[in-house]
């Protein structure tokens, strides 16, 4: 009974297919074309016949010696089983999954073979059958002797629309694109004799591809992606929803479609940070806030991420999970390990400057180096005009304001603001307690062995691309030799001014000197309108006039206690100071002449003149005090004497004092008055300076400053006047 039912079904299907063939030939004569991307013809030796259904969109192979049950999966057409039609646009992505069926093995989980949204003009019903029945029919055919084991029976050919791509996905996820030529068989000249044979039409692809990743355990799955981009022709295109071919199997897992294109990046709205993942952006945004939700239960310190907290906990426990493969060292974080290997083992410098030959291990150092080209100093001191290229130097500078000295000598407990200063102190003051490592190539003595390795690598390693001397054309392949050669140019005044006779050793000094000719003052004060030629002058101006916390430095002479605002001025004073109030020199008031004094005098005449003018001002004040304390008296005619010679005045270096002070001292007349003591009868000589007639304003000021002196009627001195003079 089953055989008769199968034969009836086959006859009906053959009748249906022949009717479709006639319609196909008629449409071909009218000049119509089919949309066909792949056509695989069977082998003529198998006695197969090509049967094609254009309206249904299904093309298959009929074989004379094939069991009818095997053909039921593709040929049986049930009337009345037409699925619902839905309109589909040509932009929808169509997917067909192809799997290899091996009839010799046991039943396996093949999933299902499903045709999805194949656009054709007419809807065609498709019946379903199980793969187990297909396998059973194949075994029966083999047992009857009709087929040999391993002989192929079925050849499926499906019409694929224009604009598709066939992709083969392996078991490990690798993707292989199959070209159109690989899908088509080699042409057989015998096929041209077949009246039903029609060569496939060549279509151009539009190069719009989509990848499908779909794998099963231990199997290779071929995935075809349909991407329709055909232009709409006249008329409406309907959609065929194909029924399930294998209904008893579970559907495969959904396939992820990953399209080609530019990778999406996420940008921070507060800075220039970009990243490929949203999670990285969310983690970065926490750096702009004070939120630190992850707290250490041992010390209470909080962190933004769990990773930072985990690394911090490793510092408490002493865990170092990241071990160096080249040595015995281990580190808390992977970044520390990478930095260690680059510094100690690989010597790799991946971050290179595009403007010069500089290369660095860390990206932060490269950014700092690039600022040396651009001149950018983004880190500004809030207390003065200092600006730095990196935060490290700014922190070091801030210690000059706060007075912090974090580095302590472990021998004498002296404290320093910089680690380099502390190391130099240890080498100079405590060399007996420090291990010394001598460089085998030069006279350098280094305290630590690791520093010796750095010295050998940087100073004495061979450089393939030689470095040129910046003063001449000499080229050296060793950094130490280059430095020693450049020292030979140290005392050469190679830079000469083209407008005067000035010459200097460094180029920056020549740049500053030329500003004296051009009048350029590039350094402007941010708080006032003053401009300066040098940065040091701007800093001095800012501290003196705009810094409320600035306290001028006082340089005190250790001999007489006099203070100066400049160190060099105090040094010149100390050379001639004898420790007395008068400030006379050690050689009886004579200035100390020497090489040091002559050099300083020739070096800065302007400073000497300004200092002499400042030093002359106290002399003027002293003279004014003497004038105020002088008493107006008339010399007695009976007793007269010549005024004694004035004491030797202090000789000052530099220009002579002002003319006003000299004239004041020389124009002061003096007189000697002999006074007899009433009790003892002794006569004392009193030297009195006679003051000239002052102006009216001066007289008023003196009258306000001191009480009026009462004179005797005859002009003689009263006892009160004499006592007041003796007291003074």
Swiss-Prot record:
- Cellular-component GO terms for this entry: nucleus
Basic residues composition bias: which ranges?
Answer: 202-212, 593-604
State where the C2H2-type zinc fingers lie. 266-288, 294-316, 322-345, 351-373, 379-401, 407-430, 437-460, 467-489, 495-517, 523-546, 555-577
One GO BP annotation is: regulation of transcription by RNA polymerase II
Q: Where in the cell is it found?
A: Nucleus
Cross-referenced InterPro entries, in alphabetical order? Znf-C2H2_CTCF, Znf_C2H2_sf, Znf_C2H2_type
Disordered: annotated span:
180-213, 573-678, 694-728
Q: Sorted alphabetically, which keywords does the UniProt record give? A: Activator, DNA-binding, Metal-binding, Nucleus, Repeat, Repressor, Transcription, Transcription regulation, Zinc, Zinc-finger
Specify the domain of life of the species encoding this protein. Eukaryota
Task: Kindly indicate whether the keyword 4Fe-4S belongs to this entry.
Answer: no
| Main subcellular location of this protein, as a coarse class | nucleus
SUPFAM superfamilies in the record? beta-beta-alpha zinc fingers
The answer to whether keyword Acetylation applies is no
- Give residue spans, biased composition: Acidic residues: 610-639, 696-705
Q: Which PROSITE patterns match?
A: ZINC_FINGER_C2H2_1 (PS00028), ZINC_FINGER_C2H2_2 (PS50157)
> Which Pfam families does this chain map to?
zf-C2H2, zf-C2H2_16
List, in alphabetical order, the Gene Ontology terms for molecular function in this entry. DNA-binding transcription factor activity, RNA polymerase II-specific; RNA polymerase II transcription regulatory region sequence-specific DNA binding; zinc ion binding
Q: What family classification does the UniProt entry report for this protein?
A: Belongs to the CTCF zinc-finger protein family.
Its job: Chromatin binding factor that binds to DNA sequence specific sites and regulates the 3D structure of chromatin. Binds together strands of DNA, thus forming chromatin loops, and anchors DNA to cellular structures, such as the nuclear lamina. 3Defines the boundaries between active and heterochromatic DNA via binding to chromatin insulators, thereby preventing interaction between promoter and nearby enhancers and silencers. Plays a critical role in the epigenetic regulation. Acts both as atranscriptional activator and a repressor of the MYC gene.
Protein name from the UniProt record = Transcriptional repressor CTCF
Organism whose genome encodes this protein: Gallus gallus
């Amino acid at each position: 009974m089953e055989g008769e039912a199968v034969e009836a079904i086959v006859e009906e299907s053959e009748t249906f297919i022949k009717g479709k063939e006639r319609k196909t030939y008629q449409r071909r004569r009218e000049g119509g074309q089919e949309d066909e991307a792949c056509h695989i013809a069977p082998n003529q030796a198998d006695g197969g016949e090509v049967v094609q259904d254009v309206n249904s969109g299904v093309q298959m192979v009929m074989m004379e010696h094939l069991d009818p049950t095997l053909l039921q999966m593709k040929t049986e057409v049930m009337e009345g089983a037409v699925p619902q039609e839905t309109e589909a646009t040509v932009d929808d992505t169509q997917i067909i999954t192809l799997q290899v069926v091996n009839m010799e093995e046991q039943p396996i989980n093949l999933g299902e073979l499903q045709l999805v949204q194949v656009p054709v003009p007419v809807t065609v019903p498709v019946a379903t059958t199980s793969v187990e029945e297909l396998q059973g029919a194949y075994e029966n055919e083999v047992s009857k002797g009709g087929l040999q084991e391993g002989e192929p029976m079925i050849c499926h050919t499906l019409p694929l629309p224009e604009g598709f791509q066939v992709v083969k996905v392996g078991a490990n996820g690798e993707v292989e694109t199959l070209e159109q030529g690989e899908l088509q068989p080699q042409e057989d000249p015998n096929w041209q004799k077949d009246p039903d044979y029609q060569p496939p039409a060549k279509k151009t692809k539009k190069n719009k591809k989509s990848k499908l990743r779909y794998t099963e355990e231990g199997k290779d799955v071929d995935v075809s992606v349909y991407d329709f981009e055909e232009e709409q022709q006249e008329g409406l295109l309907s959609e065929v929803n194909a029924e399930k071919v294998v209904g008893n199997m579970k559907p495969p897992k959904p396939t992820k479609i990953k399209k080609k294109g530019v990778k999406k990046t996420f940008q921070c709205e507060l800075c220039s940070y970009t990243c490929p993942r949203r999670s990285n952006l969310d983690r970065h945004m926490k750096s702009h806030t004070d939120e630190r939700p992850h707290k250490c239960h041992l010390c209470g310190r909080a962190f933004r991420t769990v990773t930072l907290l985990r690394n911090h906990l490793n510092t408490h426990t002493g865990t170092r999970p990241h071990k160096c493969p080249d040595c015995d060292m281990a580190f808390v974080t992977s970044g520390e390990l990478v930095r260690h290997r680059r510094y100690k083992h690989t010597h790799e410098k991946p971050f290179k400057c595009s403007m010069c030959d500089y290369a660095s291990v860390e990206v932060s150092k490269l950014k700092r180096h690039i600022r040396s080209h651009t001149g950018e100093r983004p880190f500004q001191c809030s207390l003065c005009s200092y600006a730095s290229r990196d935060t490290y130097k700014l922190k070091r500078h801030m210690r000059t304001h706060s007075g912090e000295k974090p580095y302590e000598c472990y021998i004498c407990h002296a404290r320093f603001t910089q680690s380099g200063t502390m190391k130099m102190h240890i080498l100079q003051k405590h060399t007996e307690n420090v291990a010394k490592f001598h460089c085998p190539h030069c006279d350098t003595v280094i305290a630590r062995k690791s520093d010796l390795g750095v010295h050998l690598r940087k100073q004495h390693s061979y450089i393939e691309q030689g470095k040129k001397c910046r003063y001449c054309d000499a080229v050296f392949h060793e950094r130490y030799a280059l430095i020693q050669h450049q020292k030979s140019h140290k005392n050469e005044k190679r830079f000469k001014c083209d407008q005067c006779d000035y010459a200097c050793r460094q180029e920056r000094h020549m740049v500053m000197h030329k500003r004296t000719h051009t009048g350029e003052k590039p350094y402007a004060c941010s708080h006032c309108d003053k401009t300066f030629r040098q940065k040091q002058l701007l800093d001095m101006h800012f501290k003196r006039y705009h810094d409320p916390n600035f306290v001028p430095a006082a340089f005190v002479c250790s001999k007489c206690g006099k203070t100066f605002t400049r160190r060099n001025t105090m040094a010149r004073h100390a050379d001639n100071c004898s420790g007395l109030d008068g400030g006379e020199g050690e050689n009886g008031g004579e200035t100390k002449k020497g090489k040091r004094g002559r050099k300083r005098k020739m070096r800065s005449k302007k400073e000497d003149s300004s200092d002499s003018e400042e030093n002359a001002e106290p002399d003027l004040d002293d003279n004014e005090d003497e004038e105020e304390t002088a008493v107006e008296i008339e010399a007695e005619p009976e007793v007269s004497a010549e005024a004694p010679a004035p004491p030797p005045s202090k000789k000052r270096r530099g220009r002579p004092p002002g003319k006003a002070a000299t004239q004041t001292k020389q124009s002061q007349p003096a007189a000697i008055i002999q006074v007899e003591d009433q009790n003892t009868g002794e006569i004392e000589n009193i030297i009195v300076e006679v003051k000239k007639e002052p102006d009216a304003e001066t007289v008023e000021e003196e009258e306000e400053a001191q009480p009026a002196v009462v004179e005797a009627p005859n002009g003689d001195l009263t006892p009160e006047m004499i006592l007041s003079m003796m007291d003074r």
